[in-house]
Amino acid sequence: MNRRQMLQRSVGTALSVAMAGTGLKAGATKATPMPGSAKELPKTVSGIALPDTKLAIAAYELGAGAYSPYLLNHAMRTYVFGALAGRAQKKEFDEETLYIACVLHDLGLTQKYEGDLPFEIQGAEAARKFLIEHGVSREKAEMVWDGIAMHVSIIGSYKRPEISLVGAGAGADVVGPDPAEVPAAKVAEVLNAFPRLKFKEQFLKTCADVVTRHPRAAGRTFMRDIAERYVKDYHPRNFCDAMEKAPYEE
């Protein structure tokens, strides 16, 4: 496994590197207008078809109603990059399931769905509730939950493709995809369809704001790195303190 692949396996590590200045420098492209509804989405991006089932459309509308424009575009790029990685790795996956998990993977960073749990859990809970309300099977709902909850952990990369490719796609959008899997021309097509809209700056601010309001939202992921750098008086809990205070003599 090369260094870039390892970074993509953990979005937490990936974002830490991104903050240090690592990132894909794509050539300038003329951006297409951002879609206002699912009906305005392109049919395909970089050879990847965007699912247009009723459930996929409903998931997109849920995300579009909660995300800021830059975060919605990130969610869409996550799906395309994840699907491209899956195709390059010859993995079989259910497109609709992966799409929904990718589109909703950052709900926990929105004012509508943020809370005191780690942001990835907040988002996973919201997505599962949405799916159950739409009559989706418990198995599929749990798969989406896992994809969202594990997208910031290397554990997710060892799960089935509908789960692992969420983190792969998100990681690719943070530090850039493996060129062997996603050539520069395809990256340009993705950025043209879904512009970054000052993603680095906006994402860091959003994460810092969420942790300011909900300190536990940082968990032990890249969110803690952001909190330690950008959130005043942030003092995360330490495992050693809990162990030392345990009710045992030794």
Tell me what each language-model feature is.
Residues A88-E96, K112-F119, R138:
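Alpha-helix boundary/capping segments in eukaryotic regulatory proteins
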Residues V11-G12, P35-G36, L41-K43, A66-L72, ...:
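Divalent metal-dependent phosphate-bond-processing catalytic cores, especially two-metal-ion Mg2+/Mn2+ enzymes
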Residues E96-Y113, G123, G147-V152:
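His-Asp-centered metal-binding catalytic motifs of divalent-metal-dependent phosphohydrolases/nucleases
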Residues M1-A14:
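N-terminal secretory signal peptides and thylakoid transit peptides that target proteins
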Residues M1, G21-P51:
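C-terminal segment of N-terminal export signals and the immediately downstream linker at the start
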